C-alpha cells in the first residue's frame, strides 16, 4: 500500500479570499499546540448524572454497536479564531443526531476565549446528553510528553507526572463538562518523538488512568486512545491497554485486499492480545474541504454531477464496509467512528483530483462548506443496529438461564460473539443444569466446568466444535454427572478431567478418540477409575463403558536413548538415523520403535476388549525422519552432513541430529576402537606479528567463517602464539569461498602457502621490543617449514608429523588468480599438553 497514514489531518478554516486557494492541512498533531482553557466551569449536577449514566450504558454495551464522530470545533458556528471572527456559520454541534453515541471534541483554530467553549459546556453538553450522546475531548500525545501545552510546565518526575495528569483531567474534562478524554497517538513524519518522550507520555497516561476511565477513581468518565499505529509500533498502547475503555484505530483509505480490510484483519490478530473486540473501533474519514494529495481517502462516494445526493449514499463506500466488518475471532467489534463528521453527506472530490497539491490547489464545488443533516452517520448507525449479529443472546440460543448469564458475562451479550470467542470459558456453580448452547462457541480454546453438580449429561453435541481440534477441556467437581460421552472428539488425553469426583457416573463413552490406553499410560489409570465409578452403580458392560477404536497420534520422541553408539570396522555402510534415531511415541510418551512393535501395541486390551482401532495402520501412526539431518564431526574436526558412515578404520564422531530447525539429539559414535578427538589449538590464538593488517589477522582465529582476512598482496605472513607447547597432528585452511556471510569466488582462494614453527624454542618473544620482534618474526631464517599448501581447494587439509610448538607462522605464497587472496579461518588440530609433557616428548 503506497501511502502514508497521514490520518486525522485537520484542515484550517478557509477564510475569505486570503485562504480560498490553499488548504491549511495540518496533521492531527495540531492538537498538540492547543493550550488547555484555564477558566473553571461548574456543570450542572443533572448533566453529570446523565453523562455518568451514558458512560455506563456505553461501557456495558447497552447501546449496541457504537457510532462515534470527530467534530472539528472550527466548523461550529460558535467558534471564533484568534481574530475574534466567526469562521463557519453552516453547522453546529447542537444538531448532531442521537445516532451518534460518542461525539469527540476535536479542537483547533478556535481561540481559548471563543464563545464556543461556553456554548459547549452550557448548551451542547446538556442538549446532547438529553438525546443520549456522550462528549469526549480529544488531545494530542504531545500534551503528555513535555512538548506542548500543560506538559511543558511540569517536571518529568513521578510527582510532576502525577500533577500533570490531574491538571490535564481538570482542564480538558472537568472544566469543560465532558464525559471523558481521548488521546491521539500518531506517526510523526518530522521531528519524531523519542523513546524518552513516549516513556514519559506513558507514565502520564497511567496517572490519568488512575483518575478517570474504567479503572480510575472517577468511573463516570471514558478513557480512550485513538491512533494510526499498529501494536508493534505503539509502546504507549501496550503499556496502557488494560486501562483503556476503547481503542480507536484510524483506517483512512484502502487497507488492502479485495474487501480493503486486510490490514485491519492483520492488526486485529495483534490487538486481541491486549483488548477485547468490544473495545475495538475502526474509523473512516469524511472528505475534508480543500484536502490535497496524501489526505484524500475516498472513504465516501465520489462526486457525481448526475446525482447531487451521491455523497449521502453509503452503498459501495469504504465506510459501509467498515460498518459491516467484524473480527474473525474474539467477538464483535465495538463499532465505528468517523473523522470530520461535520462534513457528513458531502461527496468526495473526484479521483481525477487525486494528485492536487496544496500549493496549486485545483478546487471543486465539494470544497465549499455546506450544512449537513448527518445522513451518512444515521445510515451507518442503522446498518449496524440492524445487523443480526448484534442481536442479544436469548433463551433460544442458551435455554439454561444460569449458563446464559455466565456466558454473557465472559463472552459478550451478542449472538455474533458466540462464534468468534476464542479464549477460555469457566462455568461454575450448581445453578447450571443444562449445557445446551455451548456448541455455538465454535472457536473456544478452553472450557472449564467446575462444580456443576446438577449437570447430569455431557455429550459431543453439547460441546464446541473446537473440542474436535485442540481445545482444552477441564472438568472438576462434576459430582452429579451420570452420562459422560466424549466420543469422536479427537481427545489425545483425559488430562483435566477429575474422574474421582464423578461419583454418580453410570455410563461413559470415550471411544473413537486418540487416547493411549496402554498398560503404563496415565490414561489407562483414568480409564480404570471411570470403570470403577460405573461399577459402583451397575454391572460393567460394553454399552455403558465404551473406550474402543482409539487412534493415538504419533510424535517424534523428545529424547533418544543412545548417547554413545558403536560400529565394528567391517567396511560396511551404516545409517545413523536407522540405527540410533528412530521410533514414534504417543502423547503419553509410549515408545513404538517399528512396525513389529506397533503390531504388538495394537493387541493391547482392557477387560478383554482391544482399545486400538483395528483399521489403524503403522504408516498412519509413525513419524517420518526424511527431513532429519545428521551433522558429523570427526576426530580431526572435519565436518560433514550425512546420516551414513562407512566403517573402514578406527574413528570417533560427534553426532548432532536436527529436524531441519533445531538439534534434537546429540551422541558420540565410535567405529572400532575409536579415536582421540582433536582440538582446534589455534582458536583464539594470539596474533604476534603480520605483514598485513594486525586487527584483520585476528579474524582467522575467531572460529567464525563469516569474516575474512585480506592479504592485500600475493604474499603475506601471520605469526601466532598458541599460549603453550601443544601436539599438532593436522592443519586446515578455510579459503575465501567458504565465507558464510558474503558469496566469494574461488578465484580469491589461497593457492600456495607454508606452515612454519619457530626454530629456537628457548627464545622469549615477550622480552623483545615491538620493532625487534617484528624483524625477528619476519625473518625466514628463524622459521622451519612443517607443511606446504599447493592446492586452491575451498578447504585445504593436511596431516602433520606430531609437531610440538607454541609459536607458528603461516605464509601465503600465491593466490588462485591475479587477485589478492583471502581466507576465513586457520586451524591447528591436535591435543593440548602441559609444558612438562611437551618437553619430555621433544627430548
Curated annotation (Swiss-Prot):
Compartments (UniProt record): Secreted; Host extracellular space
Family matches, as InterPro entries: EndoS-like_Ig-like, EndoS_F2-like_TIM-barrel, Glyco_hydro_18_chit_AS, Glycoside_hydrolase_SF, LRR_dom_sf
Result of altering residue 712 to A: Abolished endoglucosidase activity; abolished activity on both high-mannose and complex-type glycans
One of the GO BP terms on file: carbohydrate metabolic process
Effect listed in the UniProt record for changing residue 109 to A: In loop 2 mutant; does not affect endoglucosidase activity
Residues in GH18 domain copies: 65-372
Active site, UniProt feature: 186
Role noted for this protein: Endoglucosidase that acts as a host immune evasion factor by mediating hydrolysis of the N-linked glycan from the Fc region of host immunoglobulin-gamma (IgG) during infection. Specifically catalyzes the hydrolysis of the beta-1,4 linkage between the first two N-acetylglucosamine residues of the complex-type N-linked glycan located on 'Asn-297' of the Fc region of IgG antibodies (IGHG1, IGHG2, IGHG3 or IGHG4), thereby preventing interaction between IgGs and Fc receptors and ability to activate the complement pathway.
Name of this chain's protein: Endo-beta-N-acetylglucosaminidase EndoS2
Organism annotation: Streptococcus pyogenes serotype M49
Amino acid at each position: 500500500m503506497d501511502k502514508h497514514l497521514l490520518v486525522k489531518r485537520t484542515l484550517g478554516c478557509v477564510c475569505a479570499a486570503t485562504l480560498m486557494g490553499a488548504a491549511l492541512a495540518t496533521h492531527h498533531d495540531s492538537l498538540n499546540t492547543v493550550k488547555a482553557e484555564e477558566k473553571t466551569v461548574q456543570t450542572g449536577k443533572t448533566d453529570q448524572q446523565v453523562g455518568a449514566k451514558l458512560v455506563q450504558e456505553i461501557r456495558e454495551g447497552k447501546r449496541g454497536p457504537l457510532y462515534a464522530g470527530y467534530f472539528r470545533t472550527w466548523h461550529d458556528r460558535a467558534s471564533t479564531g484568534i481574530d475574534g471572527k466567526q469562521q463557519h456559520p453552516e453547522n453546529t454541534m447542537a444538531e448532531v443526531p442521537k445516532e451518534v453515541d460518542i461525539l469527540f471534541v476535536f479542537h483547533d483554530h478556535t481561540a481559548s476565549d471563543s464563545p464556543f467553549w461556553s456554548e459547549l459546556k452550557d448548551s451542547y453538553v446538556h442538549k446532547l446528553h438529553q438525546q443520549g450522546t456522550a462528549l469526549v475531548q480529544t488531545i494530542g500525545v504531545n500534551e503528555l510528553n513535555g512538548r506542548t501545552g500543560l506538559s511543558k510546565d511540569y517536571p518529568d518526575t513521578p510527582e510532576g507526572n502525577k500533577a500533570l495528569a490531574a491538571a490535564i483531567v481538570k482542564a480538558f474534562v472537568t472544566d469543560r463538562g465532558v464525559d471523558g478524554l481521548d488521546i491521539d497517538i500518531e506517526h510523526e513524519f518530522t521531528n519524531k518523538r523519542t523513546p524518552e518522550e513516549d516513556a514519559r507520555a506513558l507514565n502520564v497516561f497511567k496517572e490519568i488512568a488512575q483518575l478517570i476511565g474504567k479503572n480510575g477513581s472517577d468511573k463516570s468518565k471514558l478513557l480512550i486512545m485513538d491512533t494510526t499505529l499498529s501494536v508493534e509500533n505503539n509502546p504507549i498502547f501496550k503499556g496502557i491497554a488494560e486501562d483503556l475503555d476503547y481503542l480507536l484505530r484510524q483506517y483512512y483509505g484502502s487497507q488492502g485486499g479485495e474487501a480493503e480490510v486486510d490490514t485491519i484483519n492483520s492488526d486485529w490478530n495483534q490487538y486481541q492480545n491486549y483488548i477485547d473486540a468490544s473495545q475495538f473501533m475502526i474509523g473512516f474519514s469524511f472528505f475534508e474541504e480543500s484536502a490535497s494529495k496524501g489526505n484524500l481517502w475516498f472513504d465516501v462516494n465520489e462526486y457525481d454531477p448526475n446525482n447531487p445526493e451521491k455523497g449521502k449514499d453509503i452503498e459501495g463506500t469504504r465506510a459501509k464496509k467498515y460498518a459491516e466488518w467484524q473480527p474473525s475471532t474474539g467477538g464483535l467489534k465495538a463499532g465505528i467512528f468517523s473523522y470530520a463528521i461535520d462534513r457528513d453527506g458531502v461527496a468526495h472530490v473526484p479521483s481525477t483530483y487525486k494528485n492536487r497539491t496544496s500549493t496549486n490547489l485545483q478546487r471543486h464545488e465539494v470544497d465549499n462548506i455546506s450544512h449537513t443533516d448527518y445522513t451518512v452517520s444515521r445510515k451507518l448507525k442503522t446498518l449496524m443496529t440492524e445487523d443480526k449479529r448484534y442481536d442479544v443472546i436469548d433463551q433460544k440460543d442458551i435455554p439454561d438461564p444460569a449458563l446464559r448469564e455466565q456466558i454473557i458475562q465472559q463472552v459478550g451479550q451478542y449472538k455474533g460473539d458466540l462464534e468468534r470467542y476464542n479464549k477460555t470459558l469457566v462455568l461454575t456453580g450448581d445453578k447450571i443444569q443444562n449445557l445446551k448452547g455451548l456448541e455455538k462457541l465454535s472457536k473456544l480454546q478452553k472450557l472449564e466446568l467446575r462444580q456443576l453438580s446438577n449437570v447430569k449429561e455431557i455429550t459431543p453435541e453439547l460441546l464446541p466444535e473446537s473440542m474436535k481440534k485442540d481445545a482444552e477441556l477441564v472438568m472438576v467437581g462434576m459430582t452429579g454427572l451420570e452420562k459422560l460421552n466424549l466420543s469422536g472428539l479427537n481427545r489425545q488425553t483425559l488430562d483435566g478431567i477429575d474422574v474421582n469426583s464423578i461419583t454418580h457416573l453410570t455410563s461413559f463413552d470415550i471411544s473413537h478418540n486418540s487416547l493411549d490406553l496402554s498398560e503404563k499410560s496415565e490414561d489407562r489409570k483414568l480409564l480404570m477409575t471411570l470403570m470403577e465409578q460405573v461399577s459402583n452403580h451397575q454391572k460393567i458392560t460394553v454399552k455403558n463403558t465404551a473406550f474402543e477404536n482409539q487412534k493415538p497420534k504419533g510424535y517424534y520422541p523428545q529424547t533418544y536413548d543412545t548417547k554413545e553408539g558403536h560400529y565394528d570396522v567391517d567396511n560396511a555402510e551404516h545409517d545413523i538415523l536407522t540405527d540410533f534415531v528412530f521410533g514414534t511415541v504417543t502423547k503419553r510418551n509410549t515408545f513404538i520403535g517399528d512396525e513389529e512393535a506397533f503390531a504388538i501395541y495394537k493387541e493391547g486390551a482392557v477387560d478383554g476388549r482391544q482399545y486400538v482401532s483395528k483399521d489403524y495402520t503403522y504408516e498412519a501412526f509413525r513419524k517420518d525422519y526424511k527431513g532429519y539431518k545428521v551433522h558429523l564431526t570427526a576426530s580431526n574436526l572435519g565436518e560433514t552432513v550425512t546420516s551414513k558412515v562407512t566403517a573402514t578404520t578406527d574413528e570417533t564422531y560427534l553426532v548432532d541430529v536436527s529436524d531441519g530447525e533445531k538439534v534434537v539429539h546429540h551422541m558420540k559414535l565410535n567405529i572400532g576402537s575409536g579415536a582421540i578427538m582433536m582440538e582446534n589449538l589455534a582458536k583464539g590464538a594470539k596474533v604476534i606479528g603480520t605483514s598485513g593488517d594486525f586487527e584483520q589477522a585476528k579474524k582467522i582465529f575467531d572460529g567464525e567463517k563469516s569474516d575474512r582476512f585480506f592479504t592485500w598482496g600475493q604474499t603475506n605472513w601471520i605469526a601466532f602464539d598458541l599460549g603453550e607447547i601443544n601436539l599438532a597432528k593436522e592443519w586446515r585452511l578455510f579459503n575465501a569461498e567458504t565465507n558464510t556471510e558474503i558469496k566469494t569466488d574461488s578465484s580469491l582462494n589461497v593457492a600456495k602457502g607454508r606452515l612454519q614453527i619457530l626454530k629456537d624454542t628457548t627464545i622469549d618473544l615477550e622480552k623483545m621490543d615491538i620493532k625487534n620482534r617484528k624483524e625477528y618474526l619476519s625473518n625466514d631464517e628463524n622459521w622451519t617449514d612443517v607443511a606446504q599448501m599447493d592446492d586452491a581447494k575451498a578447504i585445504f587439509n593436511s596431516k602433520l608429523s606430531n609437531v610440538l610448538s607454541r609459536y607458528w607462522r603461516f605464509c601465503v605464497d600465491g593466490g588462485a588468480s591475479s587477485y589478492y587472496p583471502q581466507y576465513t579461518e586457520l586451524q591447528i588440530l591436535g591435543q593440548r599438553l602441559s609444558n612438562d609433557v611437551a618437553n619430555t616428548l621433544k627430548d
